[in-house]
Amino acid sequence: MSDRTRTTRYANGSLRTCQNCARAKIRCIRSVPTGSCDRCERLRKTCQFQPGRRANAGPSLSESKDRRIDALEAKLDRLLAQSTSATVSEASIDDKSPTTTPTTPRPPPDVIDSGLLTLEAASLLLQDYQRTLMPYCPFVMVPSPATAATLRRDKPFLFLAILTAALYDNMPLQRTLELEVKRTIGRCMIFDGPVSFDMLQGLLVHLAWCQYHSRPRRFSQYLHLAISIITDLQLDRAPEDRFWRTRVDFNGELDREISWGREERRAVVGFFWFSSSISQILQKRSSFSFIPYLETSCELLASTAEYDSDQHLLQLIQLQRLSERIIVASGQHTSEPHDADALEQCYRDRRSELDLYLAQLPFPLTDSHLLMMQYHTVELYLCQVTLFDHKPSAQRPRHDSPFPIEALRMGLTAARTLLDFYISLPLRREVAFNNAGWVQLGFVVTLACKLAVAAADPHIHPHMADLTRALDLSTMLSRCILRIQALVTSQMDARGDRDVFYHYEKRLKRAQWWFESRSLSRSQQQRNEPLPVAGAGEASSPRNARIAEIPAEEEFQVGYAAVSGDGFDFQWPGLFPDPTFDDMFGDWMAQGSSGFDD
């Protein structure tokens, strides 16, 4: 109620309520300072007031109650006034612009707003990403002029993913930012947030270094979310071919110009590369099949390269395509026995393709760490498929062919090259390795142990002695463990989990124990058994007679003679596969499965 009303009620010394209003138990209001109250005048009654009490008397109960009522009325007046002004303001806006849509709610505060990082710290992390991490993920390039402030404004989710990846030296804070990444993905992909190209690039960066994530890791789940964005935006086809026909929309020309240029091409190539290379080693079906558009995109990027890495993308994709063709020879997808002749032919075809690929490479293999690691991993994968993955045929395998020895030597050579490369890196360089690189290293360690134990077989050791001596796997594993130990910290995240290198160290030590225990067992067995000596008795056997008929020029080409088959079955059925050892390294290379977690 207004001040004017309160003034008239306090104007004289009488009580504030006339006798008529008091009997009716209603409020008595006088519009003028003197005369009848409004109700008595309206009803034409005599308005009489009882005289008030003495001035020095204390306030009566009714007066205190009236004052409280007045205070509540004043508060109600203010609230009504605010509500009225807001309604008038909204009405005026609607009158001026009737088509205006409701304003978009402000996004939640990011890691800078919440105080987890300062903008200066974010700038340093962005520079570290550009200098250290970006060479190992050439699919999301951040140009040098870009600043933390501009990236935060234009691509907030990519900005968050980059900060998370670059915090490898502060694991607790990195895991905290990872939670922010999960919340953002849930808000944008599950609830009502925008699904954008920024989200796609951020997912690629988040997947690239997912070895730093808390366990269980969600590689497959994030990958499928990213592929859904690629499918919805039709980024797996040329821009001119997108939305060329719409069957349910009358205005099909609106989205024809959707394109993010070179950035989108790099991103799509990157998702294929990560999906194919990792799933192949982990024996999973790739979620992203090859399409010719990938090679077309790589050729376009290489023709007018903005970055040096643009010239390597085509070779990365071509090598991965070659690797996918090796899967055909693997017996892990079928229970049917493989024919030894067909397997040998497959091995030689793939070996020739690898040699031709290397010969036609337009730059040295060592120019790209990604390509060099991938090439020798493909060699090892061919060795794995040839020697261990297939089911032997019912008939006894051929022992007059040198190709199993070729495959074993190729595998030992590739393992030594990759492990030498790793231990010769500058200290702490491996913190920048992407997830695929660590999967490849885990595969190398696993297969190197198996190959070295197999090469110690007394029937084939003479053909492998030079390579096993050069590899010196026990010493090599010790040096790898020392490198990993330099990266282990005492930090723990909010759930009490240690950093990823702590777990890598444990697995390397278990691999070393596995290898050395079997090497020791083999040595003890060899001391108790006489080594086979080639003599007249061997030459007279029918099998060795066939071996002796191998042309000398073929022996010269492969660099060693065929091995005696009396004690040698190149499939090593009693040794491989070894489930215990595979479980040992399962968590290193497994993605998205909590069953292997320690």
UniProtKB/Swiss-Prot annotation:
Residues 87-110 are annotated as: Disordered. One of its GO terms (cellular component) is nucleus. Coiled coil: none annotated. InterPro entries: prtT, Zn2-C6_fun-type_DNA-bd_sf, Zn2Cys6_DnaBD. Gene3D superfamilies: Zn(2)-C6 fungal-type DNA-binding domain (4.10.240.10). One of its GO terms (molecular function) is zinc ion binding. Residues 18-47 bind DNA. It is found in: Nucleus. SUPFAM superfamilies: Zn2/Cys6 DNA-binding domain. GO terms for biological process: positive regulation of metabolic process. PANTHER family: FINGER DOMAIN PROTEIN, PUTATIVE-RELATED, TRANSCRIPTION FACTOR DOMAIN-CONTAINING PROTEIN. This is Transcription factor himD. It comes from Aspergillus japonicus. The lineage of its organism: Eukaryota, Fungi, Dikarya, Ascomycota, Pezizomycotina. The gene is himD.
